[in-house]
């Protein structure tokens, strides 16, 4: 799975949790908080993405991520090493 596909999985799950963002033009620099995701939304998005990617990693490994582009990068690295 390539980085673009992981980014698409992220976007799909973001839009599922935050349907008001459907049609939004997502950029790697977008931050979930700025997009309107509260802590529960963010946890749900992460859980759904990890499930979609069949990853089991501690959430703490994602804590330093600043935006969805960085999140896609970290997830890509985890998929490659899984």
Curated annotation (Swiss-Prot):
Q: Which domain of life is it from?
A: Bacteria
Q: Does the keyword Transport apply?
A: no
- Modification sites for O-(pantetheine 4'-phosphoryl)serine: 39
Indicate the segments forming the Carrier domain, all copies. 4-79
Pathway in which the depicted protein is active: Antibiotic biosynthesis; bacillaene biosynthesis
Molecular-function annotations in GO? acyl binding; acyl carrier activity
Q: Name one GO biological process term.
A: lipid A biosynthetic process
Does Cytoplasm count among this protein's keywords? Answer: yes
Q: Which GO terms describe its cellular component?
A: cytosol; membrane
- What Gene3D superfamilies does its record include? ACP-like (1.10.1200.10)
Q: Which InterPro entries match?
A: ACP-like_sf, PP-bd_ACP
Q: Which UniProt keywords apply?
A: Antibiotic biosynthesis, Cytoplasm, Phosphopantetheine, Phosphoprotein
The subcellular localization recorded is: Cytoplasm
Principal subcellular localization: cytoplasm
Pfam families named among the record's database cross-references: PP-binding
User: Can you summarize the PTM annotation of this record?
Assistant: 4'-phosphopantetheine is transferred from CoA to a specific serine of apo-ACP by sfp.
Q: What is its biological role?
A: Involved in some intermediate steps for the synthesis of the antibiotic polyketide bacillaene which is involved in secondary metabolism.
- The name under which this protein is listed is Polyketide biosynthesis acyl-carrier-protein AcpK
Species, as recorded: Bacillus subtilis (strain 168)
Q: Cite the source lineage.
A: Bacteria, Bacillati, Bacillota, Bacilli, Bacillales
